[in-house]
């Protein structure tokens, strides 16, 4: 998994996909915008990579049944829950709870922009 931030948006380019083997399988259960817009559909149509499994889409929630990825024989699509397991939920919610407790205690963890902490009211 890769987080979606400005530096990772579109990090996978069409030329990266074109270098994949026809036998390659691209799996994206992270964030669709990590891949350059429309690049995956075009690459799959060109046969490089030959297959994809996706759990995330450029437009979510996905309501358009004519979405190209949904109509392709070489793509497996799941409804943005492909990563979900009981263990994953327990890990995720334990971490969230621990972070809330740390924040309430005045010792927040994983602060991406620590300068805002000096502006706390």
Write out the residue ranges for each language-model feature.
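Rossmann-like NAD(P)-binding element
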Residues: 1-11, 28
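Rossmann-like dinucleotide-binding domain for NAD(H)/NADP(H)
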Residues: 23-121
């Amino acid at each position: 998994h890769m987080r979606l931030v400005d530096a990772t948006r579109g990090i996978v380019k069409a030329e990266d996909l074109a270098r994949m083997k026809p036998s390659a399988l691209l799996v994206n259960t992270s964030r669709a915008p990590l891949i350059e817009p429309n690049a995956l559909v075009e690459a799959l149509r060109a046969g490089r990579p030959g297959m994809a499994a996706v759990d995330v889409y450029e437009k979510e929630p996905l309501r358009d049944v004519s979405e190209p990825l949904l109509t392709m024989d070489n793509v497996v699509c799941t409804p943005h829950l492909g990563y979900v397991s009981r263990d994953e939920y327990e890990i995720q919610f334990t971490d969230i709870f621990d972070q809330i407790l740390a924040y309430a205690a005045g010792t927040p963890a994983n602060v991406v922009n620590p300068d805002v902490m000096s502006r706390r009211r």
